[in-house]
């Protein structure tokens, strides 16, 4: 069936709007990216031909621009759009895998969190939950707003850690100003969490402050040593 022969409710874009992206087939999703057909062939037809050009989606993702434009109806602009979409999906997949990175030093946390936190205009207090091998098993934002030691409750944070069977946690929060100097509230909050962690047997390994492509580790700054 050609696109123009479809009733509006059956068109890929309309189905996505009414039923969500998950309701669409691979053919329909590709047709949205392809956007327009060619004389006598709809974007659905071209999408089907595109899928036939590779054994599976993973192989299609590996197709070069030259490979893509061999499919009739796929010109340079469409090939570029498809390649960009494939790469974006690949990067999102890598991000999901990176949620289980192993933390060996403060810079590992910074490398992981700076891209998502450096441009935030409001303070976000995040905890990374780690297993016994210091691999991140979950990332949770527990607070948004100006950090205050009376607002960040250890009970809430450690209840999450217990529920997720975490062996240790790392606190991370951003300073929208870009200045990564720990405030007095930052230090007080850190010490409270560290003390509670010692009691519960779930160590606070570090508190990382993120700024404008910079970070401060309260462990490296010596705040943990002073209270050991």
UniProtKB/Swiss-Prot annotation:
<comment type="similarity">
    <text>Belongs to the UPF0758 family.</text>
</comment>
<dbReference type="GO" id="GO:0006508">
    <property type="term" value="P:proteolysis"/>
</dbReference>
<dbReference type="GO" id="GO:0046872">
    <property type="term" value="F:metal ion binding"/>
</dbReference>
<dbReference type="GO" id="GO:0008237">
    <property type="term" value="F:metallopeptidase activity"/>
</dbReference>
<protein>
    <recommendedName>
        <fullName>UPF0758 protein NWMN_1555</fullName>
    </recommendedName>
</protein>
<keyword id="KW-0378">Hydrolase</keyword>
<feature type="short sequence motif" description="JAMM motif">
    <location>
        <begin position="173"/>
        <end position="186"/>
    </location>
</feature>
<dbReference type="Pfam" id="PF20582">
    <property type="entry name" value="UPF0758_N"/>
</dbReference>
<dbReference type="InterPro" id="IPR020891">
    <property type="entry name" value="UPF0758_CS"/>
</dbReference>
<dbReference type="InterPro" id="IPR046778">
    <property type="entry name" value="UPF0758_N"/>
</dbReference>
<keyword id="KW-0862">Zinc</keyword>
<feature type="binding site">
    <location>
        <position position="186"/>
    </location>
    <ligand>
        <name>Zn(2+)</name>
    </ligand>
</feature>
<feature type="binding site">
    <location>
        <position position="175"/>
    </location>
    <ligand>
        <name>Zn(2+)</name>
    </ligand>
</feature>
<keyword id="KW-0482">Metalloprotease</keyword>
<dbReference type="InterPro" id="IPR001405">
    <property type="entry name" value="UPF0758"/>
</dbReference>
<dbReference type="InterPro" id="IPR025657">
    <property type="entry name" value="RadC_JAB"/>
</dbReference>
<keyword id="KW-0479">Metal-binding</keyword>
<feature type="domain" description="MPN">
    <location>
        <begin position="102"/>
        <end position="224"/>
    </location>
</feature>
<dbReference type="InterPro" id="IPR037518">
    <property type="entry name" value="MPN"/>
</dbReference>
<feature type="binding site">
    <location>
        <position position="173"/>
    </location>
    <ligand>
        <name>Zn(2+)</name>
    </ligand>
</feature>
<keyword id="KW-0645">Protease</keyword>
<dbReference type="InterPro" id="IPR010994">
    <property type="entry name" value="RuvA_2-like"/>
</dbReference>
<dbReference type="Pfam" id="PF04002">
    <property type="entry name" value="RadC"/>
</dbReference>
């Amino acid at each position: 069936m050609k696109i123009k022969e479809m009733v509006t409710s059956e068109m890929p874009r309309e189905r996505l709007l009414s039923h969500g992206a998950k309701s669409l087939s691979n053919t329909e999703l590709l047709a949205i990216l392809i956007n327009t057909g060619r004389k006598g062939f709809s974007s659905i037809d071209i999408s089907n031909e595109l899928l036939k050009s590779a054994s599976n989606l993973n192989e299609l993702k590996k197709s070069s621009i030259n490979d893509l434009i061999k499919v009739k109806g796929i010109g340079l602009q469409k090939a570029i759009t498809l390649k960009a979409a494939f790469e974006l999906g690949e990067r999102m997949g890598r991000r999901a895998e990176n949620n289980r990175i192993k933390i060996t030093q403060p810079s590992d946390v910074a490398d992981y969190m700076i891209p998502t936190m450096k441009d935030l205009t409001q303070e976000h207090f995040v905890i990374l939950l780690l297993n016994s091998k210091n691999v991140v098993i979950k990332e949770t934002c527990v607070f948004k707003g100006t950090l205050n030691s009376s607002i960040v409750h250890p009970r809430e944070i450690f209840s999450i850690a217990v529920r997720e069977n975490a062996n240790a946690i790392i606190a991370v929060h951003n300073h929208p100003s870009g200045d990564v100097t720990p405030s007095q509230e930052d230090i007080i909050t850190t010490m409270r969490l560290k003390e509670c962690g010692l009691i519960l047997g779930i160590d606070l390994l570090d508190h990382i402050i993120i700024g404008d492509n910079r970070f401060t580790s309260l462990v490296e700054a010596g705040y943990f040593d002073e209270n050991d």
